[in-house]
A protein has these predicted regions:
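Conserved Rossmann-fold NAD(P)-dependent oxidoreductase catalytic core, especially the SDR/UDP-sugar
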Residues: 76, 100-141
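Conserved catalytic-core motifs of eukaryotic protein kinase domains, centered on the activation segment
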Residues: 42, 83-91, 125-129
C-alpha cells in the first residue's frame, strides 16, 4: 500500500514547488486549496482528491480529523500571504489557530507525520546566512505565528 500525503497550499508560491517534487516521485496526493482558485490539479495523475474550501483555517479539528482519514503525512504550505500586507496582518492569528486545529485533527486521524513549512522570517536575520542552528527571533506577527506552529 502506498503512502498518502495531504498537501495544503498546492497552488501557492512554496506549495507549487513541493507539489512538483511529490508528483515527480509518484506520491499519492490529496491537495487542499482555496475554493475558487483555478488550477489543473485534478488532471494530474498523482492527485487522488482535491479538497476545496473558502477558508482552510476556519475548519475545526473534527472537520480535519474526518478529512485526513487515511492520510499518512501532512505537508502544510498554506498561509495568508497577500503581498505587502501579510507580515503585519491579524489574519496570521487565524492561520495559527487553523493550523493548530489541523494538527489536532491530524493527530486524531492517526496521521504519522505533520510538516509545517516555515520561512526565513522566523529566524534572527542579523546572523547572516541562516542554518538550522540560527536562533529564532520572530518579529512581525507573521513570523510569530509561523514560529508558534
Amino acid at each position: 500500500m502506498s503512502k498518502r500525503v495531504l498537501l495544503t497550499g498546492a497552488t501557492g508560491f512554496v506549495g507549487r514547488q513541493v507539489f512538483r517534487q511529490l508528483a515527480a516521485h509518484d506520491v499519492r496526493l490529496t491537495v487542499a486549496v482555496r475554493e475558487g482558485k483555478q488550477s489543473s490539479l485534478e488532471e494530474n495523475p498523482s492527485v487522488d482528491t482535491v479538497i476545496r474550501s473558502p477558508d482552510l483555517f476556519a475548519k475545526t479539528a473534527e472537520w480535519w480529523s474526518n478529512a485526513l482519514h487515511g492520510i499518512d503525512t501532512v505537508i502544510h504550505c498554506a498561509w495568508y500571504a497577500e503581498p505587502g500586507l501579510y507580515l503585519q496582518s491579524p489574519k496570521n492569528l487565524d492561520c495559527l489557530q487553523g493550523t493548530l486545529n489541523m494538527a489536532k485533527g491530524a493527530s486524531r486521524a492517526g496521521v504519522r507525520r505533520f510538516a509545517g513549512v516555515g520561512t526565513c522570517f522566523e529566524y534572527d536575520l542579523s546572523h547572516g546566512m541562516l542554518s538550522v542552528e540560527t536562533p529564532l527571533k520572530p518579529l512581525p506577527p507573521y513570523a510569530g505565528a509561523k514560529a508558534a506552529t
